[in-house]
């Protein structure tokens, strides 16, 4: 019983041809997968068995405490299973043999605009226009809305769609134009924000200049503070709300804002008049009333042609309407001067003085230039707050 016998023994765990040292694996002859039957009752006599050549290799600890199967470790007899790492060199790729024969490299394809010109003309606009075409809609939506209907022949369909695709669609949008179109408004917003911050400093600068006129040669100090008020010494342009001079500061800045708005309004009126968009009619000697209106109501047309309304209609005593052209420039100033001369007769006395000043000698003009040079820095300090308004006036002059 204890010795080894070459004769296979039957029973559970007694087939020594199969590694079963622990003796708890069932006998293979009972397993239908190995085709055990009454004709082949023994595993060793089964012609369809797997001989397992590695079964005869006895590993370390096969029958000892390590419980290592005789055919090697739990992972097999390979060096990796035994814990030895070996580097297997990768096989080099096979040499190419199609250099001289076989498949040749694919040549470069011609541009799409040459091979498929209709694809360059197709976009979403022409696609929707094609769908709205009655001939195309008849292909998918027969008459009456039902599935029954007469479909055009295939050759007519192809010719119809080809004729529609041959139409030139809208040009493809250029990304450069889109980028430049977005960059322009961003630069305008940045410049506008910068000018706005500068314009907001104009009232404070003009307020400082206004208050400095009362403190020539000294530091402006608010006169509203007294011994009873617990207010520290401060500038009259930065009065707190509890200071008695606060209301005067607000009044000065309100007047300054009105002056700035009046200046902008005058510039806008002069600009509109320069563009011929301001129908100001000058007073004509001998005419009692004037009225503005289209030139087609006049019996005598105005001289010259213009795309802007450039004529005034007068009504003399005979009842006929006569049109006169509006001056292209300085009509507003001329109108104001004539209007003021009619109501204030003493302004006519200034005309000879202006004419005399214009006819002065060059020596007088040089003296005036010298005075401007001498008073230039002071004038610059006065006019410097208005410098941010110059770019705005320039943009209005160019784009209006």
Swiss-Prot record:
Residues 2-181, 275-348, 399-400 are virion surface. GO terms for biological process: caveolin-mediated endocytosis of virus by host cell; fusion of virus membrane with host endosome membrane; virion attachment to host cell. Interacts (via its myristoylated pre-S1 region) with the host SLC10A1/NTCP; this interaction is essential for viral entry. Residues 96-106 have a biased composition (Polar residues). Pfam families: vMSA. Residues 1-51, 85-115 are annotated as: Disordered. This is Large envelope protein. It comes from the Viruses. The gene is S. HAMAP family: HBV_HBSAG. It comes from Hepatitis B virus genotype B2 (isolate Vietnam/16091/1992) (HBV-B). Belongs to the orthohepadnavirus major surface antigen family. Residues 2-253, 203-253, 370-375 are intravirion. The keyword Glycoprotein applies.
């Amino acid at each position: 019983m204890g010795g080894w016998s070459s004769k296979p023994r039957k029973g559970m765990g007694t087939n020594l041809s199969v590694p079963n040292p622990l003796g708890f694996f069932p006998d293979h002859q009972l397993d239908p997968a190995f085709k055990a039957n009454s004709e082949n009752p023994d595993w060793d006599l089964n012609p369809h068995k797997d001989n397992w050549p590695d079964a005869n290799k006895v590993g370390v600890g096969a029958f000892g405490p390590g419980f290592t199967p005789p055919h090697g470790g739990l992972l097999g007899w390979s060096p990796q299973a035994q814990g030895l790492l070996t580097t297997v060199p990768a096989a080099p790729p096979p040499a190419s043999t199609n250099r001289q024969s076989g498949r040749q490299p694919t040549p470069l394809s011609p541009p799409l605009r040459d091979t498929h010109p209709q694809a360059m003309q197709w976009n979403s606009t022409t696609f929707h226009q094609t769908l709205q075409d009655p001939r195309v809609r008849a292909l998918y939506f027969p008459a009456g809305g039902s599935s029954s209907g007469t479909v055009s022949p295939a050759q007519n369909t192809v010719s119809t769609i080809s004729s529609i695709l041959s139409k030139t669609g809208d040009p493809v949008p250029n990304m450069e134009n889109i980028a430049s179109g977005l960059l322009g408004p961003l630069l305008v917003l940045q410049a506008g924000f910068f000018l706005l911050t500068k314009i907001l400093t104009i009232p404070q600068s003009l307020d400082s200049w206004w208050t400095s006129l009362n403190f020539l040669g000294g530091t402006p100090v608010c006169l509203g503070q007294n011994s009873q008020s617990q207010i520290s010494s401060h500038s009259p342009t930065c009065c707190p709300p509890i200071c008695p001079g606060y209301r005067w500061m607000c009044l000065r800045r309100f007047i300054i804002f009105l002056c700035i708005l009046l200046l902008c309004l005058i510039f806008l009126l002069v600009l509109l008049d320069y563009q011929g968009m301001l129908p100001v009619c000058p007073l004509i000697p001998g005419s009692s009333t004037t009225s503005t209106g289209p030139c087609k109501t006049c019996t005598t047309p105005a001289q010259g042609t213009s795309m802007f309304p450039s004529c005034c209609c007068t009504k003399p005593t005979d009842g006929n309407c006569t049109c006169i052209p509006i001056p292209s420039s300085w009509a507003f100033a001329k109108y104001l001067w004539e209007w003021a001369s009619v109501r204030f007769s003493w302004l006519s006395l200034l005309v000879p003085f202006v004419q005399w000043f214009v006819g002065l000698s060059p020596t007088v003009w040089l003296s005036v230039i010298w005075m401007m040079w001498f008073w230039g820095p002071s004038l610059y300090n006065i006019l410097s707050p208005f410098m941010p308004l110059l770019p705005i006036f320039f943009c209005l002059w160019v784009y209006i």
